[in-house]
Amino acid sequence: MNNALSVTVGGGGSFALVVKSDHSLWACGINDRGQLGSGTTQGSAEYIKIMDNVSKAAAGDKFAFAVKQDGTLWAWGANDRGQLGDGTTIDRLSPVKVADGIADTNAYYALTTDGRMLEIGNGFAEAATGVSRILNGSLAIMTDGSLWSCSVEYDDYYITDDAISACEDGEANCYVIKTDHSLWLTEMFSEDETSSGTEIAHGYKDVASFEIDYDGGWPGFVLLDADNVLYYLDYIDGDGNLQLKKIADNIAAFAFSSVTVENDCGTHFCIDTSGQLYAFGKNYYGVFGKGRTAGYSDTPVTVAFPN
């Protein structure tokens, strides 16, 4: 069974984790700190099975997490800063159980089944309550649909209402998709707490940011529209119009790493509406699963799994 439910890419595109439709977890790529969870530090240019009964996986820099269907959270990889949440600073080459009662995770925060957002690498300290979904980083959607940036060390910050997806741009701005599929640009930490931002487009259901310049760290964006067409957002012109570059049709989900749109500095994945997984960009670490660590593709190519 090769259908994919979700994919996450870590380490700047150096490794990838895929949850298949049978809830098995597969990994591929570089493995110098055990980030594949295979029990060794040997990398793989073919996908290898790591564990079963997984509902969600999240990849960090050189570490990763998985939530199992029984609500347990598992962690592996680099742990020099205690980022795995296991109470040690010892790297883990195989998954270790670090928490119970978990509904979701990203690379830094876990969401409990009772709606608490916990910072994994900070002793599972509570960052927020009443959370419905966690997005990337510190962004969270509350049970009332409001979008917040949450933190253990700092005050939680309200961003806007009626959100279904959002991402930050690294410059204190946030792209938000609302329940009516409108796309908004909102200034975070604005002194004008009455402003909900500026509506810039309509007809989208997911948005994500990705790094497009290693030196400056400037972000780019990708959009999935209501018709399941995946686009790069190149820029917004002076009249507020989106300048888009289509990537693929019939896409249900995606994962992006560092990239410049016109060259080969990124590794990306998308899953079509039938569950087929595709990769594009660079294959320098073998994450295309083709058995080699070379090559580049401007267009999505099929990712295969061993029988």
Regions found by a protein language model. Give the residues of each.
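Eukaryote-biased RCC1-like beta-propeller repeat architecture
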Residues: 1-307
